[in-house]
Swiss-Prot record:
Pfam families (UniProt xref): Ribosomal_S8
InterPro entries: Ribosomal_uS8, Ribosomal_uS8_CS, Ribosomal_uS8_sf
Family to which this protein belongs: Belongs to the universal ribosomal protein uS8 family.
Subunit annotation: Part of the 30S ribosomal subunit. Contacts proteins S5 and S12.
Lineage: Bacteria, Pseudomonadati, Pseudomonadota, Gammaproteobacteria, Moraxellales
Name listed for the protein in its UniProt record: Small ribosomal subunit protein uS8
One GO term of the biological process aspect: translation
Length: 132
């Protein structure tokens, strides 16, 4: 059986690993997952993300999680747009997460970017998830 929502699976794996105080989490890789992980590294929510090839044609994305004083850096990680109800917003309607303290992950025509970068570039897109 194929996975229907790979982004929700990724976010759930990260959330569960942080609740269990794991150092890292591994999952099947895809271009979308890698782009989201790179954005989370850039924004400082995770320590690192790297793709390793297992030789059988399947790549694995390994994410090293971040903690501050024993608590996970990511307090909230939530899927917003989902396969059954896509959420698209124009450049002026991109939501701010926790009054700018969090980040909304936006899929635009220029690739995956944060809400701040999308507003600065003047483009809207699909609001994938919220992280704070």
């Amino acid at each position: 059986m194929s996975m229907q929502d790979t982004v929700a699976d990724m976010l759930t794996r990260i959330r569960n690993a942080q609740m269990a105080r794991k150092v890292s989490v591994a999952m099947p890789s895809s271009k979308l997952r890698k782009s989201i992980a790179d954005l989370l590294v850039q924004e400082g929510y995770i320590a690192s993300a790297e793709v390793t090839d297992e030789g059988n044609g399947k790549a694995t994305l390994s994410i090293e999680l971040k903690y501050f004083e024993g608590k996970p850096v990511i307090e909230v990680i939530k899927r917003y747009s989902r396969p059954g109800l896509r959420q698209y917003r124009g450049k002026d309607a991109i939501p701010s997460v926790q009054q700018g303290l969090g980040v909304a992950i936006v899929s635009t025509s220029k690739g995956i970017m944060s809400d701040r970068a999308a507003r600065a570039a003047g483009i809207g897109g699909e609001i994938i998830a919220f992280v704070a």
